[in-house]
Amino acid sequence: MVMLMEQFIGIVKDILVLIASFGILLASYRLWIEKDRKNIIYARIHILGVIDCACFLIFIALGETLLAFVYLILAPFLAHAIAHAAYNDNLSE
């Protein structure tokens, strides 16, 4: 029974990693094909937020909970810093 449960948990982890990886690929593709327009940097930061969520799920699935929570805390600060710099410095693509 224990062995069956471990196999089930392993399968669930693999499925979670596949779904999150697909999300990363889809978001990266969307990031790549997006045309330049006004305030595109904010849209790109949003897409990177989607990638961050997928990476968080992958870390959880791989059993790296401490790394996942550190990533979950630091990633929004980094995105905010980039957006704040773009707003204050009027960055253009």
From Swiss-Prot:
What organism is listed for this UniProt entry? Methanocaldococcus jannaschii (strain ATCC 43067 / DSM 2661 / JAL-1 / JCM 10045 / NBRC 100440)
What protein am I looking at? Uncharacterized protein MJ0292
Keyword Transmembrane set for record: yes
Q: Where is this gene product found?
A: Cell membrane
Q: Which is one Gene Ontology cellular component term of this protein?
A: plasma membrane
Keyword tags: Cell membrane, Membrane, Transmembrane, Transmembrane helix
Q: From what superkingdom does this record's organism come?
A: Archaea
Report the membrane topology from the UniProt record: Multi-pass membrane protein
Q: Where are the transmembrane segments?
A: 8-28, 54-74
